[in-house]
Amino acid sequence: IFSPVGDAMRIEISRQESSELCRQYGIPVPAFHHVQNRLEARKLMQDDPRPYVLKNPICSPFSPIHAIVCESVTDTLGWIERVDYAEGLFLQEYLGKEEAGHFVFISGGEISSLVTNQEFKRAFTGDMGPLAGAPLAGIVEQDPDDKYGLAKELIHPLKPWFKKTGYTGPLQVTAIRKNGVWHAIEYNIRLGVTTTALLLRMLKNPVDVLLEVVRNQTPVLEWHAEKYFGCTLTLAGYGYPYVVPSVPKLPVEVSVPLECDLWWNEVDEEGGQLYMANHKNYEMGHRIADVNACAPVMDSAVKLIENEIRKLRCLGSYYRLDLKELAAKYSSLLTSEKAALR
């Protein structure tokens, strides 16, 4: 895994430590609380009633809790009665939907901005349905100059901590804007499934850059101007992301070769035929493939993906139909932010 090691990993692993670190260095964060059981959660809601996002305290794919976004106090009161408290519960104030992310490499004593992005984890078109474990769609924009100020506001203040821990590797901050102020809601120490494939396409020298970061050297970034924007769209398998009864080995068909990148996820091959992976002891729908495209302008990347993903077929599969609308919202959000910085 391409990430920092040792104490530098704590910024992702422990949500409470991450939030406290931000407060120490003057980075805005939502109100947050860590409780151990249902009684403590009930008491918290009496003392400080707000809508909260419910999360696992220790960031792990094997935790019994995955993020539940509560948009009202009533939502929160309902969910604190249902979650599994085996690892406790982290409650983070819900700040709204104006969300964006920014990636950097920290290497050679320098912070090098890479891309600004948005990820869309709601399962269905229109941002409806449950949060999936990984994004169903994503947008990435080259941003080595940090033109929206996300790195300046939410990453650069942590320089003393990076030096103290010997942090070397990638870092993503996910932030939500409320009342004109960006708040850090999460840090990730990996490039991530959505952004990595697009970022490496955007760079002219991806292998050289990765090797420079591994060696703790300042990376020399060279960008493809014609790949300024990138988009990704996931073909999700039968039942995803719900728990469903076991399904048969469903064939995955590609009518004609795609004219953009196709990344297979959970598929099996037998006799030259692809099938949606059938996990006999893991009864979940599965992510079949990601379709990625880069272009000089956002609209071109979106149009290419929408055309190409139609070439894939698997019974009961689906993908989000609102990538064009998501791209427009992304542009609107960050255009207003850029204007505010002038």
Residue ranges of predicted features:
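Short, conserved charged micro-motifs
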Residues: 41-43, 74-78, 146-149, 240-245, ...
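Generic C-terminus detector
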Residues: 277, 282-342
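Active-site "cap" helix and flanking loop/linker of ATP-utilizing ligase/carboxylase catalytic domains
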Residues: 151-172, 188-261, 265-270
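Glycine-rich phosphate-binding loop of ATP-grasp-fold ATP-dependent ligases
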Residues: 31-32, 52-79, 96-103, 122-145, ...
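Short, well-ordered beta-strand elements within core beta-sheets of diverse protein domains
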Residues: 137-140, 231-235, 287-295
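Phosphate-binding core of ATP-grasp and ATP-grasp-like enzymes
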Residues: 84-88, 95-142, 151-184, 188-195
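Conserved N-proximal alpha/beta basic substrate-recognition cap immediately N-terminal to
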Residues: 1-48, 52-53, 59-60
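Buried hydrophobic positions in well-ordered alpha/beta secondary-structure cores of metabolic enzymes
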Residues: 22, 55, 91, 102, ...
